[in-house]
A protein has these predicted regions:
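Non-heme di-metal
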Residues: 1-290
Length: 290
């Protein structure tokens, strides 16, 4: 039986793919509604999106056992790099002095340490949910119509990517059972507890290469490493209500995935402990049988 998801995901994403020339209303640009401060945040997001390059290299390296998922990376990588490109195209047209240099883009390409593939999958699923909400909030903040449309457009891509990752999580659940449940619940607890952390919990803001610490987050390699917190807290004002939406979306999807209702990170953590204890008992039993 063929259980590959890539062919179907390719068709569904291809059907809604937007055209950078035809679907972005470039002729509606209003220079009076774009400040230098806003243009700088667009530059930072363009560079951040470029980090899909090292993320893809990581995914392909750590998923050599899974050609279906690796093939899907071709679609994900294309669309994420397109996000970087459309933001750079906006700057090229309307703030050319702000276009990232090749050196600035290349700075975010560095090796990520190997990590458990299932945990990484869950981390990026949560990252897509978070980015969808960040971009929707950014679209609300901007009044210039073209960049507003761009953020709305790429936010929908991020939501679709999250949906695709969820399909692979369901497949992993069928193939790996409690091992997958434990991995997804572990990262889910971390991501659903973001309100208690100082820094935004997104893959681009996490340490991923011990040898390069502290310059081992994507954000630490940007021209302004402190921009993200300022963008979220002071500019687009991604407040508690927005954060609540992110957490609710994560818990809602895990409730469906695990067929058990979670309304708080604490409930999910209790489930994580149950599953971990179960997997440990199975592992102990296998050792005893040897």
């Amino acid at each position: 039986m063929n259980t590959m998801l890539y062919p179907e995901l390719y068709r569904s994403l291809e059907a809604v793919r937007w055209d950078m020339e035809k679907d972005i209303p470039w002729d509606k640009f209003d220079a009076s509604l774009l400040t230098d401060e806003q243009a700088k945040t667009i530059k930072m997001n363009a560079i951040t999106e470029w980090s899909a390059l090292p993320a893809t290299e990581m995914f392909l390296r750590d998923n050599q056992h899974d050609s279906d998922f690796s093939a899907f990376m071709s679609v994900w990588f294309f669309e994420e790099q397109k996000h970087s490109l459309v933001l750079m195209e906006y700057l090229r047209r309307f703030r050319p002095e702000m276009v990232p240099t090749e050196e600035e883009l290349h700075a975010v390409r560095f090796e990520f340490d190997p990590a458990p593939p299932l945990e990484t999958l869950m981390l990026h699923f949560c990252g897509e949910i978070r980015l969808n909400h960040w971009y929707r909030c950014a679209a609300d903040w901007h009044t210039e119509p073209v960049i507003k449309q761009i953020y709305e457009t790429i936010s929908r891509d991020e939501a679709r990517h999250g949906g695709a990752y969820l399909r692979y999580m369901k497949k992993a659940l069928n193939n790996c059972g409690d091992v997958a449940r434990a991995a997804f619940a572990k990262i889910g607890v971390l991501m659903a507890s973001a309100r208690r952390t100082e820094k935004p919990l997104h893959p681009t803001n996490l340490h991923v290469n011990q040898a390069l610490f502290p310059r081992d987050t994507v954000q630490s390699r940007l021209p302004d490493p402190e921009w993200l917190e300022r963008w979220l807290d002071e500019q687009i004002r991604f407040d508690g209500e927005w954060e609540k939406k992110v957490v609710e979306r994560i818990l809602h999807n895990l409730s469906i995935l695990f067929e058990r209702t979670f309304t708080t990170a604490q409930e999910l953590n209790r489930y994580r402990r149950e599953v971990t204890a179960r997997t440990n008992r199975v592992a102990d039993g296998m050792v005893d049988a040897i």
